């Protein structure tokens, strides 16, 4: 709460100190005789008194202290309102005089402390006042205090806490100006001080005794003594202030008596406020301050704390106290002047020494010692001080003094040499500050009148209208606009006079020429569309707000122009003259440029200018026309038309003598044209200037005709020629310099070629020839392509002409037929002759006109076709067109016969014409459809072959076979399913609908998958005639027509993963082999979609529409977002971190840090009991120190001291240097230029400016010098660097001295100063050009090689026939696998990545492996595509768009550098450093750079076209960024996957061959054992051999086997036994026949070979879990031992009973297998695929299967080309061969 608010709350509102006391009584009636203070106060009590009601106690100073102290004399902290007991006063005082006239309700002598008065102090020593009579008695100097009741702290200091939370208390010094307390800065303040006397109005009667009685003194029960004017003061405060008694009293005292007592003036303010060097002096001053403030009475602890302050803090308090004294004295003098207006003989001189007074500012301005900060303070004072202050400044000639400084700046700017940047910027800053001050001055009447009274003020402002600083020009425009409006036209005249004065002084021709010129240059400096493109240097350096500033400047300029033109309201001719002067300066061009800002305020001003112009010209013409003599009309319609103006003048002067002079003047004007070029322009300019003088003679002060003609024409022409000559000389010098630079560059180039020698030059020329050869080949290819495109366009044009003629002829014949029908109908109905005329027939169209127009169009088309045919070659018309031509243009005989026949048909049967009409329409539609639907052009010039393209033809027998096979493989579709074709696909159908067909669908799906993976697929049908239909599958009956080529939407996507099995994923799975980890738990035939989950619980089935997408995986267990800990921590509040108190015992040296994680909330942890107080911690540390623990810790864990390198003399010198640039930039300088660290800064700068090779070849240095912080100079760095720099763009820059020595700067700052700062105007372009000389060749090699590689790879993709065949094979097999609604004509390259995702039923072989195996075994001629497109692997990570951007950047960089050399920053070497060789170095390389840029452009265009074409060729979207980026990557991934599949397949085949060899060896051993058993009448027992096989399998697997694996192995054992012992077609009881082994081996060998070979398309992967097949890599002695054990067992078991049981068990097993097979056909279980009946009666033999499908055997031939019938019988125990009987490989007929 502010202090005034507190005072009002505590006293004014509650006690008799309030304002409302006696408010209703007049001032004179408020005091009666007995209550008058004249009778109460001593005679001297009125000295220096002031009105309390109209005074302003504003001498409030705040002193901020940094400690919680109580500075009062009493030991009170807050000040409960108490009264001092009378016993505390000294004994020589008078007793109080009672006052009885006050009302008792308001005279409470003592108020009880309210709660608001307690605890207000910041200190915590006590709360209630402690009264010490003895102390008061010692400190009391006078008997009675006057004024209000003294506060508890009588030293005059009020303590108030800061609202901002600072630590120290704020002590407010309240003192009335003029009182001793105010003078000394020591007064009192209590809660009752701020009252009615705070009114700011001053009392007129300052010496009145009545007025000295404020509301503070009315209720006081104390009487003032002679020595006090307000209140008691401590006796110890008289060392710094003297108190004087008033010399006069009474109401009639003179003004002199009101002069305040003189105070000891401080002679040197700066010295008085400067801190002493000796801290002991500061301590002494602080002791004095403590005595002065009464702080000695503070408690002992507070005094000790204050005495322990550091010297800096003590000086802060002393400095604040002294500052308060000075400000109080200054305000006292100011108030005295405002009150009494005394100005002794030395008043003005005294005020000139007062800092902040108007006279002081004027003195500083006149001495030219005023600083920018003081100018800014003056500007603020002129805006905020009272009017009297501003008036005093004007009367002290302040405005003229400011103007003189402004004139000096402008004179230096115009006539003097170009100043260095620091001084120039300083002058511009001062100019801006002065203009701000002048604007503030003229914002009132005194300043504006003074400006009109002194012409030099306006002249100075007009001169600043041409200032380089945009802010200054804007302010001056505003001030001049105001002056034009001031004093009813006088200001406008003064401004025009000042403009003419400046024009003559600067040697300009026109009044507004210089001004309009700089306005136009400023507006032209704005970049295009407000950007930095094409912007001027001023606009670029202006920062973010430059656009707004520029628009505001344009607004100010337009307002000033309108004010200058429109100010003379009653003088039309003067307005037109001023406007004409503006128009001659190009104001119309300027207005059109300003309109480009699109700023509403500017547009309004422009519209205002144009409207007033039109109105004035209209008034002028009306006046002139009304004044013509003899009613001769001389009216001018357009003032911009010289003919009308001349006619008007001639008509007005006709018949007068003036007409002769006018004619003579025109004739002389006509003679000017004989002069050439610039002379004529200058002549007209001179004539215009002279005519303006003549026309406005004596209309303006300086436009006197005699004065204007006192010059020679030659002198004027000489002055007019100067500009053109200078411009011409400048252009010539610039051209000559560029020629010289080019010659030097050519010389250096020749020198470099000579240095290369013969070998180097030959090598370089050979390289260039190779590049040129490549470019020529590239251009030749492009020309061939363009020729082919041109031929295509020509052919299409001819085709279009034929189509148009065809349609026109068809339409013509249709209309003629319709007309014939109408005529025949008219004849039948016996209509009149008029109605039969086709011209009178009614209809929508006028048929006769239409027929005529069509005939003309046909003739025109025929002529056009013939003419174009001569140029492009004649194309034969189509048959239909030729027929129509013959029909319309044939011989007369056939045509007449044809028409007669048609007429007979129409007359007999009108319907016949309809048939003929229909025929024509059908033919037209067919032909049009044929020609419009063709993308190729072979059919256009032959007969229509649309019938050939409707449906591909094939052999009926082959079609029947294929249809039967497809019908067998495609799932059956019910009638209900046929109705749902438009509904979602089967993956999107509900699970309930799919569950109804679960059995049948499961069987069919299984069969289809098995066929796709195991059985050889049928060969693709022969491709149809049309390439667009090659991908269509043979349609099932009834065959629908195939889709037309190119019709419809995009081709269907590649086969997605099959849908989840019916019934969802949560059902109980049938007993398939255990899936590998990561698969589904459902039936294995459909492979899992990507991202599937394994194990229960399975995810829910995908929703409709998203079945094929990848479901987002749920978060894994354990990563649930927001657990108990997160909730717990969130529920806790923010921990309150207590600041730990540092112990006084600290290690002597730095120790290693112990990094730990702090507990956030120690209140609820074990550390809550460890929280000790600071005293306890201190004791703990003391105890640890006594025990030696801390010393041991300090000894063991001492941190290693880091040595500071460079801490010697060099570092000290560096510290002495001044650093301006940032630390980061300085460090970057040291890093980049580390190689040159041993050289001085001047040498490094010389090498950089000379463009030495060691600089240009150092990439680190070049990259650093091109960085943004080197090219862009921050504003603060620019200001600090300016005094050290030199402007190389100015004249004679080499001899210009720097303001400050650059050796004061650090080494890095000096390098920055000499290079990037001084050459900043062309540094960026310079470094870009130099970097180009070193980078254009390697960049060209790098980028062009990539461009050529992209073109080469794209062409290899386009030319690779093998790749297209492989993709076609993939498409055919995919369509074979897919349903009818998923057939595709092509697929995108992204589908290739999914080939490896489609796996077989055992998740072992992928579709990619299958395709690779088919191509390698069946189509080996296609395998070379991997070498043909191998380049895609090297380009898979290449971003083609980024490559194109790099190439464009390369080309644009060379173009930009060339533009800079031609007409940019590098075009004018005059602006360069004198030793800079950038132009010579750059010119040498630009010829080769331009040539390489042109070649790069050709390579880029070729690459872009080839790449886009190859993307379109492969069906990709060349406008999609993702597709462009991943095109090569997709093919590279497919190629890498192909190679992996090839390696995998070869490894599997090799493993299978080794396995077969091992098993063949085992089978021979088993055959020997069986033969021995037969010789000994001991047949082999199936159970015994099965036990041995089971034992061997268990030994290999070493793990328990699943039931289905045991079943498969059991069936394999039975199969093996039948292959060895049982012949095909024999009965089981004939096992012991002699021919059994031989016959069985032969027949079974065929079937087994078939089975083995047919499994070629799905090789097995070895499973280590127990279902793996035995391979030869395992120890073969196990097989040998097993064979020997089998022989022993056969020898030991010759029991016939066992033979019988073995036969019965075999029969039982066969019976069970048949039963399982029958059940499997209806149940759809997995075992139905693995069980095959062995009865030769029910199953077809393998030979039947081979004869049924001869094509399939070609796909499953052995890899080595062996005859399968020659192979011996084999036993394959691999997972696919052993699990699947041989009859499963036969084609299914179900």
UniProtKB/Swiss-Prot annotation:
SMART domains: Drf_FH3, Drf_GBD, FH2
Alphabetic keyword roster: Cell cycle, Cell division, Coiled coil
Domain spans labelled GBD/FH3: 274-702
Domain (DAD): residue spans on this chain: 1581-1613
GO biological process: actin filament bundle assembly; mitotic actomyosin contractile ring assembly
FH2 domain mapped to chain residues: 1141-1564
Coiled coil: 724-811, 1435-1566
Chain positions covered by the region annotation Disordered: 1-275, 328-350, 975-1119, 1465-1484, 1596-1790
A matching Pfam family: FH2
Domain FH1 per the UniProt entry, residue ranges: 955-1136
Keyword Methyltransferase in record: no
InterPro entries for the chain: Actin_filament_regulator (IPR051661), ARM-like (IPR011989), ARM-type_fold (IPR016024), DAD_dom (IPR014767), FH2_Formin (IPR015425), FH2_Formin_sf (IPR042201), FH3_dom (IPR010472), GBD/FH3_dom (IPR014768)
Polar residues: bias regions: 205-236, 1644-1661, 1720-1746
Biased composition (Low complexity): 39-62, 187-203
Listed GO CC annotations: mating projection tip; mitotic actomyosin contractile ring
Regions of compositional bias (Basic and acidic residues) in chain numbering: 24-35, 328-341, 975-986, 1694-1710
GO MF entries: actin filament binding; small GTPase binding
Residue ranges, compositional bias (Pro residues): 1015-1026, 1033-1118
Organism domain of life: Eukaryota
Biased composition (Basic residues): 1608-1620
The keyword Translocase appears for this protein: no
Annotated PANTHER family: PROTEIN BNI1
Recorded family membership: Belongs to the formin homology family. BNI1 subfamily.
UniProt function note: Involved in cytokinesis. Overexpression results in growth inhibition.
Domain notes: The DAD domain regulates activation via by an autoinhibitory interaction with the GBD/FH3 domain. This autoinhibition is released upon competitive binding of an activated GTPase. The release of DAD allows the FH2 domain to then nucleate and elongate nonbranched actin filaments.
Protein name: Cytokinesis protein sepA
Source organism of this protein record: Emericella nidulans (strain FGSC A4 / ATCC 38163 / CBS 112.46 / NRRL 194 / M139) (Aspergillus nidulans)
Lineage per the UniProt record: Eukaryota, Fungi, Dikarya, Ascomycota, Pezizomycotina
Gene assigned in the entry: sepA
